[in-house]
Amino acid sequence: KQLTTNSTATANFDGMIDFNEKKGFICDMDGVIYHGNRVLPGVAEFIQWLHDENKEYLFLTNNSGYTPRELSQKLARMGLDVTEEHFYTSALATAAFLRDQAPGCSVFAIGEAGLLNALYDAGITMNDVNPDYVVVGEGRSYSLDTLTKATNLVWKGAKLIGANSDVSGPIENGIVPACRALVAPIEMATGTQAYFCGKPNPLMMRTGLRMLHCHSAEAVMVGDRMDTDVISGMESGMSTVLVLSGVSTRETIKTYAYRPSMVLNGVGDIVSLARGEKTED
C-alpha cells in the first residue's frame, strides 16, 4: 500500500507537514539515525536533503555518554558528514542547568566522557565526599558500588539530577536500560525525586530552537519516542514526526493522550514527501 499526501493513513493525526516550508529540524539520534553502529535506511538521503535545501538542523539526543565530537566521529564512521555544531546532548543540558542554578557547585557524577567533560567545561568540580549534587547519566561506570555511593550521598543531603528521563534505549539486538531506569533505585532507596534535564524538559528544547535560530512554528521535531521526542516537540509548539524505526509502533501511539503530527517509517520518508514522491505505508 502506498502513502501519498492525500492518503487517509495520517488522517487520525494533526495532518500533513509541508517540509519544504519548515526552516529547522530537530532530530533524535538513537532509533532515528542509527541502531548501535548501523545507520538506518534513508538517513544519508535525509542529511543530504537538509544540506541541499539549506535547512537548519540539530541532533538533540538524550544520550549523555558522548561528546559532540564523538557523535560527529561516530556518524563519520557510518559515512555521514555532520560537524560538531549540529549536536546538543542531555549532558550539555545538564551542565548548563547546574551552571545557571548553582555556579561553582560540586557533583558526584556517574557517567561517561560526554557527561564528565560537559560538567568540567561548565566549571563544575567533582566531589565524592560531600557534593551539592549527585548526577546520573548512562554508562559502563554504573555498578552496585557507585549506586550505593550515590544513594548514601543523596540520603545525606545531595540533590539528585538525572541527565534524561529515558527508561530504555534501542540497540541492535533489543533494548538497554537508560538513565531513568538507573536513577530509579536511588529515588526509591532515599525517597528523593530526581530532576531530569534532557528531553522532554522545555529548557533543552528552548536551547535547541535558539541554536537553530528558529521559531517553534518554523521547526519540526523528529523522534522515535512518544514520551520524550513527540511530547517535547508538541509542548514547544513544533510540528512532530514519530518515526517507526526505533522503539515505537503504531500500537504504542494508542496508549498516549496526545498524537504526533505525522507517523512515518523513517526519516527517508521526509525527503520523499518533500519531493512529492510516494512512501510506503
Tell what function each PLM region has.
Residues 2-55, 64-88, 95-281:
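Asp-based, Mg2+/Mn2+-dependent phosphohydrolase catalytic module
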